[in-house]
C-alpha cells in the first residue's frame, strides 16, 4: 500500500467516512478525500466499497475530477469498457485539469491508440501554465512508462530540466531497465541507494535489475536488504520468491509466495496461485497443484486469462493434451487486446502433430506477440529467421510424439 494510506492522517479520514456510512457522523469530506478512500478500497480488494465511495463523492460533488477519474479508470481497467470510461470522463467539469488530460490519454492507450495519446498530450502542452509545465512533462513520461511505452517515456523525460532530482533519476532507472540497458539502470540505482540506503523501493528495483540479467542470487541479496528494512514489503517478498523459483528452489519459493499472499490483496494476491501450483506440479505433487489451480480460477475476475496461465504451466510440465484443451477453449474468449499464450498454443499443436491448426494459430501468434512467438518457436526454424518468416518456412519435423500425460481431474 501507498505510505499515505498507512498514515494516521488517512486513517482519520477513513474513520470519518465509515462513521458517515453508519449515519453516526456529520463530518465533511471533500471530493479528493473521498476519491482517496475509493482508491484505498480498490487497493485492498474491496471493489464494491470503492465504487460506492466514488459514487457518493460524485453525488455530493457533481463533476468533481478525482472521483470521476476513479470511476472512469474502474470502467476502463475492471469493466474493460472504454465507452463507459469516456462518458464518465465527459462528466468532469474542469476539462483543463491535468488529471483530465491524463485520463483521456489513458483511455486512448487502452485502445492501443498510443500515437494519438502522445499527440493529444503534446497538443495540450502549451495550454499548461508555465510553472506547471515541468510537472506535466514528468507526469506524462511516468504515464507512458507505466504502459511500457518507453520510447515515448524517454522522449518526454528528455525535456525535463532537473536531471539531479530524485524523481528524475528514479524514472530514468526504470526506463533504462525497460530499454535493455540494465547496467546503466543499475548505476543510477546504486547512486540512489547511496543517497538513501533505507529505501525499499531502490533495493527492489535493483533486485529486478539483477533478475532480468539472470543474476538470481544477486537479485535475492538485493531483496534481502529490502526485507531487512521491512519484512512485509510486498515487492521484496515477490522478487525473492521469483528468484528462488528461477534457481529451482521450489520449496523456499513457495514459502515466500505464501508470505507475499499474506501481506497483499486482490488480484495481486491471486495471480501467484498459478505459480505455486506450477511448482507443486513440477514436484509431482498433483493434489497440491490442483488445490492452487482451483484457488486461482475461483478467485479470478478474468477466468479465461487464468485458464490460459494454467495451460502454460501444464504445457511446461508435460501435460500437452490438457494444455491444448485449455488453450483452444479459452483463447477464443479473451478480449481483442490479449496477447499471451498464442505461441504456446501453436507449440502445443506442433507437439501433438496438429499441423493444420499449428499453421492457423502461428499466423495469429505472429500478429499478437512477436517476442513470445520467437521464444517458443525459434528452435523449429533456421537460425536468424524472423518470426514473420515462419509461415513461409517448414518447421523442423518432430523427433517424437508428445507424451500422453493427463491430469486426474
Predicted feature residues:
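TPR-repeat structural position
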Residues: 10, 47, 81-82, 114, ...
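Canonical positions in the second alpha-helix
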Residues: 57, 89-92, 124, 159-160, ...
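Start-of-helix register in tetratricopeptide repeats
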Residues: 32, 66-67, 99, 133-135, ...
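Register position in tetratricopeptide repeats
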Residues: 43, 77-78, 110, 143-146, ...
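Structural marker of alpha-solenoid helical repeat scaffolds
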Residues: 60, 91-95, 127-129, 162-163, ...
Amino acid at each position: 500500500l501507498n505510505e499515505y494510506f498507512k498514515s494516521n492522517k488517512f486513517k482519520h479520514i477513513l474513520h470519518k467516512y465509515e462513521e458517515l456510512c453508519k449515519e453516526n457522523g456529520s463530518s465533511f469530506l471533500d471530493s479528493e478525500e473521498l476519491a482517496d478512500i475509493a482508491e484505498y478500497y480498490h487497493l485492498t480488494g474491496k471493489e464494491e466499497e470503492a465504487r460506492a465511495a466514488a459514487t457518493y463523492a460524485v453525488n455530493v460533488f457533481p463533476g468533481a475530477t478525482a472521483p470521476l477519474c476513479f470511476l472512469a479508470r474502474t470502467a476502463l481497467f475492471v469493466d474493460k469498457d472504454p465507452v463507459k470510461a469516456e462518458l464518465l470522463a465527459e462528466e468532469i467539469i474542469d476539462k483543463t485539469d491535468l488529471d483530465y488530460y491524463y485520463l483521456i490519454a489513458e483511455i486512448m492507450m487502452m485502445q492501443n491508440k498510443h500515437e494519438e495519446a502522445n499527440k493529444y498530450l503534446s497538443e495540450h502542452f502549451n495550454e499548461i501554465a508555465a510553472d506547471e509545465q515541468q510537472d506535466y512533462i514528468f507526469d506524462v513520461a511516468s504515464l507512458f512508462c507505466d504502459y511500457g511505452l518507453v520510447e515515448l517515456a524517454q522522449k518526454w523525460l528528455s525535456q525535463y530540466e532537473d536531471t539531479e532530482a530524485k524523481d528524475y533519476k528514479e524514472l530514468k532507472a526504470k526506463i533504462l531497465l525497460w530499454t535493455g540497458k540494465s547496467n546503466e539502470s543499475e548505476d543510477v540505482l546504486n547512486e540512489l541507494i547511496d543517497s538513501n540506503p533505507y529505501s525499499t523501493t531502490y533495493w527492489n528495483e535493483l533486485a529486478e535489475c539483477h533478475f532480468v540479467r539472470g543474476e538470481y542470487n544477486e537479485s535475492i541479496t538485493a531483496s534481502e536488504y529490502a526485507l531487512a528494512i521491512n519484512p512485509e514489503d510486498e515487492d521484496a517478498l515477490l522478487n525473492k520468491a521469483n528468484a528462488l523459483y528461477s534457481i529451482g528452489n521450489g520449496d523456499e519459493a513457495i514459502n515466500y509466495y505464501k508470505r507475499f499472499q499474506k501481506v497483499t490483496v486482490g488480484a495481486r494476491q491471486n495471480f501467484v496461485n498459478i505459480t505455486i501450483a506450477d511448482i507443486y506440479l513440477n514436484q509431482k505433487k498433483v493434489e497440491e497443484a490442483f488445490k492452487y489451480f482451483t484457488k486461482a480460477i475461483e478467485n479470478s475476475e478474468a477466468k479465461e486469462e487464468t485458464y490460459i496461465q494454467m495451460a502454460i504451466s501444464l504445457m511446461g510440465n508435460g501435460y500437452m493434451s490438457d494444455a491444448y484443451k485449455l488453450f483452444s477453449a479459452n483463447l477464443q474468449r479473451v478480449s481483442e487486446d490479449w496477447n499471451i499464450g498464442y505461441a504456446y498454443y501453436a507449440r502445443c499443436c506442433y507437439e501433438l502433430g496438429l499441423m493444420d491448426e499449428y499453421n492457423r494459430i502461428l499466423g495469429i501468434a505472429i500478429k499478437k506477440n512477436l517476442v513470445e512467438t520467437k521464444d517458443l518457436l525459434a528452435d523449429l526454424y533456421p537460425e536468424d529467421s524472423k518470426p514473420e518468416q515462419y509461415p513461409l518456412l517448414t518447421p523442423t519435423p518432430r523427433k517424437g510424439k508428445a507424451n500422453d500425460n493427463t491430469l486426474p481431474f
